[in-house]
Amino acid sequence: MGYARKVGWVTAGLVIGAGACYCIYRLTRGRKQNKEKMAEGGPGDVEDAGDCSGARYNDWSDDDDDSNESKSIVWYPPWARIGTEAGTRARARARARATRARRAVQKRASPNSDDTVLSPQELQKVLCLVEMSEKPYILEAALIALGNNAAYAFNRDIIRDLGGLPIVAKILNTRDPIVKEKALIVLNNLSVNAENQRRLKIYMNQVCDDTVTSRLNSSVQLAGLRLLTNMTVTNEYQHILANSISDFFRLFSAGNEETKLQVLKLLLNLAENPAMTRELLGAHVPSSLGSLFNKKEYKEVILKLLSIFENINDNFKWEENEPAQNHFSEGSLFFFLKEFQVCADKVLGIESHHDFQVRVKVGKFVTKLTERMFPKSQE
């Protein structure tokens, strides 16, 4: 019995070993055949990705590597086991492939590279990376490449014609703040083009909501404000932001200097449009807005805010719109401007503000505001 049992164990071991060898053979042979299919232009074992066929996110090749293996996915072979020498080597090779993928995209995204300007075919590959990849570092590098190329006027049309606008806009749904910021930067560069603006207007509400709800003074918030500022350079799409003006004043009141200045650039675009005057006057402003003039605030911030007030005052016909003034609620910008004389008296005081230019501009604005708001009292 002992001998028969020993023979049985040996036989079983041989069968299991042969089976394992055969499985490894099939796996390696399958990978080789799949690579040959892809090298010949076929889809391999990956389903066709529509317009991105032949340029999927795992087809990006590194100029420094002769291999056509996938470099954007960290792929661990079935035989890679933790704690084994073979597994350690396999994982090291997988990490190396991922690193090469990142460098391959970043090489083209680098401003110091000679390959900064991509051809339409290369832009198509980068767009496919953005569309198909789920790896944050791949998305980040690809979006940097797109952002750099979108800075060139001739590439803005190419990226649009390749279907890049909805591809990049879809990334706005991500929760990764770094990736979202890069997507906003790409859209900001693309929005300089008039046709791109026409197509991007459908995303303005989403960008606006994300901007006002993002962490205060964050990179995502600033990138969103820059995009909205670009989208409101012309008067055509400013009405989309009419319901968010109060939120912008809230950001202005609570934000740091950089956030304040970016909000003011956006509000200045709106203030230059006479059609947006009523929306601006009806917006709720924080009570802390008046205290801005009581302290030694940044000079540029106060001067830009006064420029906004001047544009609103010039565009609003106070005497003609006297019946409509009853529609403005307490706490609105309209009532703030009516009571601006109180703030101005403090600013004009010698001890209130150290900058002579600010005090002069405040004095001129108050005089102009009084003449426009209370013309009958001047008679």
UniProtKB/Swiss-Prot annotation:
What are the alphabetically sorted keywords of the record? Cytoplasm, Membrane, Mitochondrion, Mitochondrion outer membrane, Nucleus, Phosphoprotein, Repeat, Signal-anchor, Transmembrane, Transmembrane helix
Q: Region Nuclear localization signal: list its residue ranges.
A: 89-98
User: In Gene Ontology terms, what is a biological process of this protein?
Assistant: axonal transport of mitochondrion
Q: How does it sit in the membrane?
A: Single-pass membrane protein
Q: Would the keyword Membrane turn up in this protein's UniProt record?
A: yes
Annotated transmembrane regions: 7-29
PANTHER family in alphabetical order: ARMADILLO REPEAT CONTAINING PROTEIN, ARMADILLO REPEAT-CONTAINING X-LINKED PROTEIN 3
The molecule here is called Armadillo repeat-containing X-linked protein 3
**Which gene codes for it?**
Armcx3
